[in-house]
Amino acid sequence: MPIVDSGSVAPLSAAEKTKIRSAWAPVYSNYETSGVDILVKFFTSTPAAQEFFPKFKGMTSADQLKKSADVRWHAERIINAVNDAVASMDDTEKMSMKLRDLSGKHAKSFQVDPQYFKVLAAVIADTVAAGDAGFEKLMSMICILLRSAY
């Protein structure tokens, strides 16, 4: 299933949730490194996205990005937001509330182009569980909610 950022997706099944938790656990247990690797892959594959991160401007190499405290800080925030979504899979109202709040911040305060949520979600899905339809469904749920304030 490709990741979508509009419309709706079917609820996650119990089997999908179990598989997501199993795939996510080793990534989150090493969240500092995993988060930086994901964010660096995102920026090196989509350099235009860096314009929304003034502190990252001018960092053109993966090595520069990996050494940046600002990149590490933001990577941790992204990983924690995904972890919150994984932890809230059984309480979609809680997940929705948190991600809608995050959407508002990104739309109003940071003025991030929402197309990049889907791109980042694809990098995360590829890193965590490449080709897994359940994880892609979770990433779709996240993307749809992150676009809610736009």
Swiss-Prot record:
Spans through the membrane: none
Keywords from the UniProt entry: Heme, Iron, Metal-binding, Oxygen transport, Transport
Coiled-coil regions listed: none
Domain of life where this protein originates: Eukaryota
Domain (Globin): residue spans on this chain: 11-150
Alphabetical list of InterPro entries matching this protein: Globin (IPR000971), Globin-like_sf (IPR009050), Globin/Proto (IPR012292), Globin_lamprey/hagfish (IPR013314)
Pfam family for this entry, one: Globin
A molecular function (GO) term: oxygen carrier activity
Binding site for heme b: H74, H106
Assembly and interaction partners: Monomer.
Assigned protein family: Belongs to the globin family.
Protein's UniProt name: Globin
